[in-house]
């Protein structure tokens, strides 16, 4: 995972591998979303890592959007925000 700071937060380049198959994803995380989802209890990278774990438990890597804002996950999985806060904040 590569992290690039942006004016509003961070941009993450995430590569998922399984065997020889790989998928690449670009995820944006605003400071506001980071604060709301993690409460500052972990680094932004950990929020993205746990978010991908959440997604991979529900769909194959090929189904994950190639580019998205982290808040979009809750549009497809309404329990995302509650679950990710529970994982991160305990």
Residue spans for each PLM region:
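Short helix-capping/linker segments at secondary-structure and domain boundaries
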Residues: 56-63
């Amino acid at each position: 995972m590569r992290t690039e700071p942006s004016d509003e937060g961070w941009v993450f380049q995430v590569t998922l591998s399984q065997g020889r198959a790989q998928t690449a994803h670009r995820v944006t995380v605003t400071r506001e979303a980071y604060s709301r989802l993690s409460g500052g209890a972990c680094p932004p990278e950990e929020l993205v890592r746990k978010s991908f774990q959440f997604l991979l438990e529900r769909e194959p890597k090929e189904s994950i959007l190639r580019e998205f804002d982290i808040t979009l996950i809750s549009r497809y999985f309404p329990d995302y925000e509650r679950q990710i806060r529970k994982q991160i904040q305990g």
